[in-house]
């Protein structure tokens, strides 16, 4: 088999394993996006709601909303805005995490027909104006009274922010019958999570629900569920984007869970008390990063005393997570020394390439040794071209006599693939790369593509002129040329495509990928070029001896 065919075989095998890995990772480890963007998570009591009630029509709702006031609250990490209509949280901005326009990221987009990031409703009975009272710097209370079936109820919503600037909000609700001697005539209450987390997917254009997915965690597993009804005890439910999420936890949830079209629909809870009712929810609204999420697993690490909530399970673990963890630690060490994530990616890539250099060297040396046998191999191929069995026997004999393994050039390449995928996954999903600048004015955010010019509209499928994809393509071509011992004129059309078409194809595939990922790819290409040059010099010296 010629050297070019062996290289082609290695490329085919690499592409095959790339496809298998992406399929497995997508099926078992990636998020599934729901088909409906309305996020409504309801909690209904376990007896039928069949009593008459007084509903509020749409005109009354609009009138109340128009007369409502907004209450601004600032904490160390949040800009929060409450509305006295419903006592709901209608805006929640993250102070320390900015979008491309350098404004705090908005965790909720409120439309006319929606009432905030999360809210409690007893049918339409609580769509009313609330009074506001600031209990202390961290606790804010909203209160209202309403009439239902000739009985009067007091409804209180109490929000408590973390005293330690944790991305968690405690929501307590209290429903009291003003006449304590009477039982409740209300059998229905619903918790609604309507999270439209902000994404800036195109320059200057804010979008919501992009890359938004729902998940539910129970029985020690992160699940997306199947359509139908099942009885579960979830620890939390939530909505996530690539970098941010809203998760809701409640103690002792023993519920019936109904899911339709991969969208969370209904939870059935236990019956409320006779004359009073209270409940507590914990809402995480912040970065989708284990450093922020895992503190709620131990009660001594958070101001709310929560433990074993396991919010961190919302961050899916890749198939190669065990490789990504040490890589992330190494990258963090580099950042602590030189606080630039772009340089950390470069240094990490160099470290990884040095560690796998023995495999690369072995692969290239095996290929070089096989190339020395080309004259003898061609003689055998010509001599036994009409006898395939004898041809294979003679080729095997030649390999044994020369001490050459024909697969020696392929296996080391395949062994490097897990490292490649682990580094790819780390750079592509690492939260701390969001908003991290490498070269100001050019690469201002490692989590999105670089840009030197913005068109203001789409040209073909692009909105920006980017430099990194061109550098990636050129270095990939140079790497391919240097690693090959076959001249261009001796290549067939299929071989020419694999050698030179693949870098061009990757140029289009990776054009809009995060710049951090392209920096990793370019560093790999440059290191490979230098590495191949060194190996060729080493092999040449061995031949001269």
UniProtKB/Swiss-Prot annotation:
GO terms for cellular component: plasma membrane. One of its GO terms (biological process) is protein insertion into membrane. It is found in: Cell inner membrane. Its main location: membrane. The chain crosses the membrane at residues 10-30, 319-339, 341-361, 407-427, 467-487, 502-522. It comes from the Bacteria. It is a multi-pass membrane protein. Keywords: Cell inner membrane, Cell membrane, Chaperone, Membrane, Protein transport, Transmembrane, Transmembrane helix, Transport. One of its GO terms (molecular function) is membrane insertase activity. Belongs to the OXA1/ALB3/YidC family. Type 1 subfamily. Required for the insertion and/or proper folding and/or complex formation of integral membrane proteins into the membrane. Involved in integration of membrane proteins that insert both dependently and independently of the Sec translocase complex, as well as at least some lipoproteins. Aids folding of multispanning membrane proteins. Interacts with the Sec translocase complex via SecD. Specifically interacts with transmembrane segments of nascent integral membrane proteins during membrane integration. PANTHER family: CYTOCHROME C OXIDASE ASSEMBLY PROTEIN COX18, MITOCHONDRIAL, OXA1. This is Membrane protein insertase YidC.
